[in-house]
Structures are given as C-alpha cells and as structure tokens.
C-alpha cells in the first residue's frame, strides 16, 4: 500500500475548494470517518451529493462507519490522560474489535489508491482523526494532515500518546511519551512486531 494516508476536514469549504484540495494532494479515494455522514449546514457534504461529486472527479468514496467518532467513555476508562471526554471515549473505543475492523477496511482502501480520511472538523487536533493517526503512525504508516493548498503537516502524535511494549497507550502511567520525542511513522522493532502479530492496538 501507499505508505502515506492523508486526512482532511471539509469544514465550511465550498465543494469546489474541497475538490481542489484533494486534487492538489493527488488523493484518489476518500475514507469518510464521520459516524453520521450528513450535514444540514453544509448539504454538499451529505453522503450522496459528496459521493457523486467525487465520482465525477474519478475519486472513490468509502464510508467507514466503524471509524466514526462520538463515542462515550467507559465509567472505568483507563485513558484518563485524555481530559476531553469525547477523545477519552474514542480512546476506549480504539481497544475494541469494531475499531480494528474499521481500521482494516481503511488499510484495504489505502492499499489500492492514495487515500485521505475525511471528517467535518477543519483542524485535525480537534477531531478524532488525531487518534486514528496515532494508531496508524505507531503501525509504521505515515499520516499527513491537509490544512490548505500550500500547507500539510506530518502527524506529530497527540500529547497523551505513549508507547508501551510496542503498543499505543493513553494510560498516563504506562510506557514513554511519543509527542515531541518520536516521529511518525514509528519504526521501532517492537512496533513492527506488534503490527505483524496483533490486529488490535
């Protein structure tokens, strides 16, 4: 597969601007990671109009519901490094089979065509795309966030992200921090071994 997966937020962009961004970064497939793929305020990004507009540009569309956000944290959540409850809920969700299945679907799409994850939020650090990016980077996949036509950034890991025995963790007492110390993608021997032997994160 292409060793890079992109991310983008449709925000309030006119559809033409959004399509131009995809073209600028040579995106060939969009993986929609919105849990609910519709928008009353931005109807051009509802699922069917978006699918049609992308198809006209030769861009594939894939809704991966299993990667959608808006997950509630468990009462016994160990991921207290995330003070934001929405992100803590998603960190809990990452440990489950449904997320693993969704991630495998994303990797399958990205294995065929240059792919960008898409959600509504303009900036990645306010979106669950950030946590998906953490997972991908630990697995040795480069993630790049599209900001505008001239600015795209390699994922820098979220501040709560840690590496413990080659695995991603958001438990504050486990392992060592990734943010500011490791680059995406993580290329440790432990990370590659975990990726080869275990489909969970």
PLM regions: where:
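Residues lining hydrophobic/aromatic ligand-binding pockets adjacent to catalytic sites
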Residues: 1-201
């Amino acid at each position: 597969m292409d060793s890079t997966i992109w991310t983008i937020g449709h925000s309030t962009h006119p559809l033409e601007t959004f399509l131009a961004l995809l073209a600028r970064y040579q995106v060939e497939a969009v993986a929609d990671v919105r849990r609910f793929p519709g928008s009353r305020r931005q109807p051009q990004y509802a699922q069917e109009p978006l699918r049609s507009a992308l198809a006209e540009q030769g861009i594939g569309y894939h809704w991966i519901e299993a990667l959608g956000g808006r997950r509630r944290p468990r009462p016994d959540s160990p991921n207290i490094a995330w003070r934001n409850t929405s992100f803590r809920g998603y960190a809990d969700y990452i440990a489950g089979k449904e997320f693993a299945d969704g991630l495998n679907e994303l990797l399958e799409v990205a294995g065929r065509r240059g792919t960008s994850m898409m959600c509504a939020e303009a900036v990645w650090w306010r979106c669950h795309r950030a946590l998906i990016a953490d997972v991908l980077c630990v697995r040795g996949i480069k993630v790049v966030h599209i900001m505008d036509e001239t600015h795209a950034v390699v994922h820098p890991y979220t501040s709560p992200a840690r590496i413990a025995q080659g695995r991603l963790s958001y438990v504050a007492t486990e392992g060592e921090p990734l943010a500011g110390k490791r680059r995406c993608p993580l290329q440790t021997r432990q990370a590659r071994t975990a990726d080869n032997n275990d489909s969970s994160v």
